[in-house]
Regions:
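N-terminal secretory signal peptides that target proteins for export/translocation
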Residues: 1-5
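Bacterial N-terminal signal peptides
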Residues: 9-20
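Early extracytoplasmic/domain-onset interaction patches
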Residues: 25-63
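Extracytoplasmic
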Residues: 28, 42-44, 53-55, 75-77, ...
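Non-catalytic architectural context of zinc metalloproteases
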Residues: 36, 48-50, 65, 70-79, ...
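Juxtacatalytic substrate-recognition/specificity segment
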Residues: 47, 210-335, 341, 345
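Acidic/histidine-rich catalytic neighborhood
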Residues: 285, 316-384
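C-terminal recognition in membrane/secretory proteostasis and scaffolding
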Residues: 346, 356-627
Length: 627
């Protein structure tokens, strides 16, 4: 809800807020954050807000950019005290909008002092609401520790922020340092918009590496870990990130930031995800990600994806997501561009920069294609609806994901943009590509500072037509609104490849299974299971579904033998063609039954095969562009 005032407040209230905002523009709000208790999972803030006497409503940020939903972690806000000249000021929460606080500023008062604590979660899921601290590090998201005047534009409200760190800790951020001493640092005054867009990574074991030092503006890899060895990535990996910086310059022909910081948290004590910002990214991964080759490869998309968002999502942003403050609801209908195009370009950049080999890229692409070759939920819900409903889908979990669908605009969006790229290449005989669209669309205006240039569906269509004339509106809508069981595979076919299935998993699939401790039998028996035999998901209308299996059930035995993944694989192999059916003993909530799966197709794992006579456009796409 964006209307923050009760209807009876009337005009006098609006005037009071307006005068308060006017003063805030000439006298910034100061926000002092104390992180010395971060290892104990409690952060402290003191906020001093210039005000004028009368009614005032302040709000806690609700709709967080990049999270695409009303995810502001207000449930972990605590210790909210307001004083004026040392005397308490009573506040009252709005009865409808839980993020709004009403109060009356006493006569003669020109500023309010507010105390806010944030209880850093131990949860290993969620974005800024998830775990963000450990004994040796912390990631500060400013939106968790502030309020601001209601009905104001985030770009108009100015803040002077500062932080105080535990002894011996260092930090990285896109904010400019203004002053300070000891463990306290003051940053240059910025708008609320820029503040929320500029997290701070800090820790005891902190390292900063300058990337592609010959480029302007400057780029930095900032790392904080729970142990000193975890920030010692190899020279080879640093060189790959150097190339990533150069490849983005070659692709986007522009940069829209004063400097850029990859803020990488290496810890199992924090939630693992990536969250984009204009001049930085909040990248949280497992502790050994930079020193273990398998983990580095599996996480190879993360930094290219979040970096790409600086152009696609932060600079060029869907109009429905370009809201003026953090209380106005966002519209996610163009997330298939915001996230889908970013997923596509991020994967391509990972290959172009050498983070992945071309073969690793293709193996990952085969797993995406196979998932969307077997996506029954598409028959009732199109990819457009997953984008529109994004705000309720990020938290969706549990079984039957293939039937409910989730944030499919990421990976199915990637298939759509591969289709766009290969179509342009095919129509122009290789003379033009999606690179040309990106250079025009995201390079609009050349190099700029961090600002937002919104776009609509029609702008995307016009941008594609500026590269090559085509009925792009129909092209896109036919894919976005499709209810076919399988997602469109035109990008693979135009790229010179087709999806096939073989009896052995490719190296990428094997790495994913080893990392997650799960085993993927979706394309044979139609189920996904853990090492212990716990069924994590079942493919709707697949063999296991028709046999009566469901998520959460426990596989006890296979053909009379105690379950192991290898025993199940052997049973699938033995059943091929005219072999015996696979017989399972299954436990479900304390009850047991025998399930007979009459399947004879053998093991099936995805791979990409070349299509004879079609140019290998996919390999052309993966070639480095930087000179």
């Amino acid at each position: 809800m964006s209307g923050l005032w009760m209807k009876c407040a009337g005009t006098a209230l609006a005037v009071a807020v307006g005068s308060s905002v006017a003063m805030a523009q000439t006298a910034p709000i100061t926000l002092s954050v104390d992180l010395t208790d971060a290892p104990r999972k409690i952060l402290h803030a003191t906020e001093v807000m210039p005000v004028t006497p009368g009614p005032l409503t302040v709000v806690y940020p609700k709709w967080i950019p990049g999270e695409h939903g009303p995810t502001g972690p207000i449930e972990n806000m605590a210790g909210f005290f307001i004083t004026a000249n040392g005397q308490p000021v009573k506040w009252e929460r709005d009865k409808v909008d839980m993020f709004a606080y009403h109060l009356t500023v006493p006569q003669g008062v020109t500023k309010l002092e507010m105390k806010i604590d944030f209880l850093a979660s131990s949860s290993l899921s969620g974005f800024s609401a998830g775990g963000s601290t450990s004994e040796n590090l912390a990631l500060l998201s400013w939106n968790t520790l502030l309020v601001y005047p209601a009905d104001t534009n985030a770009s108009d409200v100015m803040f002077t922020p500062s932080i105080t760190l535990p002894a011996g800790w260092k930090f990285g951020t896109a904010l400019d340092k203004e002053g300070g001493s000891g463990q306290m640092t003051t940053f240059r005054t910025v708008s609320l918009e820029k503040l929320v867009d500029s997290p701070v990574l800090t820790g005891r074991y902190f390292r900063e590496v300058a990337l592609a030092p010959e480029t302007t503006p400057k780029h930095y890899l900032d790392m904080a870990a729970d142990g000193p060895e975890e920030v010692e990535l190899s020279k080879e990996h640093i060189a790959e990130f150097d190339r990533l910086v150069r490849e983005t310059g070659a692709l986007y022909k522009s940069r829209h930031y004063g400097s850029y910081h990859f803020l990488v948290t290496l810890s199992d004590e924090v939630a693992h995800f990536g969250l984009e910002h204009h001049q930085s990214s909040d990248d949280r991964v497992a502790p050994r990600t930079f020193i273990d080759d398998q983990e580095f490869t599996l996480n190879g998309l993360l930094l290219p994806h979040e970096f790409t968002h600086s152009w696609n999502g932060k600079y060029r942003r869907p109009a429905g997501l370009a809201t003026s403050n953090y209380q106005k609801p966002m519209e996610g209908d163009l997330l298939w561009v915001y996230e889908g195009l970013t997923e596509y370009l991020g994967d391509v950049l990972a290959a172009r920069s050498g983070i992945w080999t071309a073969e690793q890229y293709k193996q990952r692409l085969s797993t995406i294609a196979a998932e969307y070759d077997n996506r029954p939920g598409r028959t009732w819900r199109d990819i457009q609806d997953t984008a529109t409903a994004a705000q309720i889908l990020y938290a969706a979990g549990g079984g039957w994901d293939n039937w409910r669908l989730s944030v499919d605009y990421y990976d199915e969006g990637e298939l759509i943009w591969l289709d766009v790229d290969t179509t342009i290449r095919k129509m122009t005989d290789g003379k033009k590509s999606l690179n040309d669209f990106v250079a025009k669309f995201h390079g609009l205006g050349g190099d700029t500072g961090p600002k937002v240039v919104p776009y609509t569906f029609d702008d995307v269509v016009a941008g594609l037509n500026s590269v090559v004339a085509n009925d792009w509106a129909t092209f896109l809508r036919s894919r976005l609104d499709s209810h076919a069981y399988q997602a469109p595979m035109g990008g693979l076919e135009n790229g010179g490849y087709k999806l096939t299935y073989t009896d052995k998993p490719n190296a990428w699939s094997a790495m994913e299974d080893a990392e997650s401790g799960s085993y993927d039998f979706r394309y044979s028996l139609g189920l996904h299971t853990g090492k212990s035999g716990r069924v994590s998901d079942v493919l709707k209308d697949g063999v296991a579904d028709k046999g009566g299996l469901g998520p959460g059930m426990q596989l006890i035995a296979v053909n009379g033998r105690a379950f192991t993944p290898d025993v199940l694989k052997a049973a699938i192999h033995d059943a091929k063609d005219s072999g015996p059916a696979v017989e399972l003993i299954v436990e479900n909530t304390g009850f047991y039954k025998v399930v007979r799966l009459d399947y004879h197709g053998g093991e099936r794992y995805p791979r990409l095969d070349r299509v004879p006579g079609v140019p290998d456009r996919l390999d052309d796409i993966l070639k480095p562009e930087a000179k």
